[in-house]
């Protein structure tokens, strides 16, 4: 298996998982304000 392919897949997975988390954090920050 290519290491570059694994890195790309892991980065995409992290982005897809971190996306909603970042949105939730921004939502909470706006709610606190």
Swiss-Prot record:
Q: Which residues form a coiled coil?
A: none
Q: Which UniProt keywords apply?
A: Chloroplast, Membrane, Photosynthesis, Photosystem II, Plastid, Thylakoid, Transmembrane, Transmembrane helix
Question: Localized where?
Answer: Plastid, Chloroplast thylakoid membrane
One GO CC annotation: photosystem II
Pfam families cross-referenced by the UniProt entry? PSII_Ycf12
One GO process term, biological-process aspect: photosynthesis
The membrane spanning regions, by residue number, are 5-25
User: How would you describe this protein's topology in the membrane?
Assistant: Single-pass membrane protein
Q: What is its main location?
A: plastid
Q: Which cysteines are joined by disulfide bonds?
A: none
Regarding protein family, the annotation reads: Belongs to the Psb30/Ycf12 family.
Q: In UniProt terms, what function does this protein have?
A: A core subunit of photosystem II (PSII), probably helps stabilize the reaction center.
Question: What name has this protein been given in UniProt?
Answer: Photosystem II reaction center protein Psb30
């Amino acid at each position: 298996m290519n290491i570059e392919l694994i890195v790309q897949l892991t980065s995409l997975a992290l982005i897809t998982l971190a996306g909603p988390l970042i949105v939730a954090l921004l939502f909470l920050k706006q709610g606190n304000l």
